[in-house]
């Protein structure tokens, strides 16, 4: 024989019919906060632990940090749309967001600083200090044992790997750029990386290809970059592809002169 079940929602609905609007709102607030205490507090504690673990990873890549920032942003948006963004939840999510964006900026700086340490041929000026963390070079090219790519005798191969890594990196960062608020910072970081890559291509043209024309030409490298980037019909990709086309044209002009 089945035991009778207790339907609390029915009693609650019946009792709330006699409440004023102010009392009903206060009652809903109490229910919401009690639900938060019982259900969401443990979940938020788990999220905080997971988030801290991700952020504490040494040399966390930009893409990983952007994914976490986007997750927090989406949770905020969903909570707002469902009208359940109570102050406790908003505080937790906003704190995570504010902790993440400085790390994104630092990770971009690491990518730039890592590239600054590289040369193809003799370095002009002091060796820039790297902030460490490896950057895309270590993760995608298997690491480099020297800061002068000519020393390994495979400058063209190393440079092409770096350029290929950048096209992937660029596409991933752009696809993860979901808020206009931080778009300028992210595109600015990509622009600084582009500047360092341009320097390396020019050093390759001067110190390697000018004397040993048995490898890929710097112009062909730039044309290849343009082809890969322009295959994605987004404004950011088109703009970046145009920069590489312009650099390719500059090498054509230098050859003719």
Task: Please place each PLM-identified region on the residue numbering.
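Long alpha-helical rod scaffolds of large eukaryotic non-enzymatic complex subunits
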Residues: 1-257
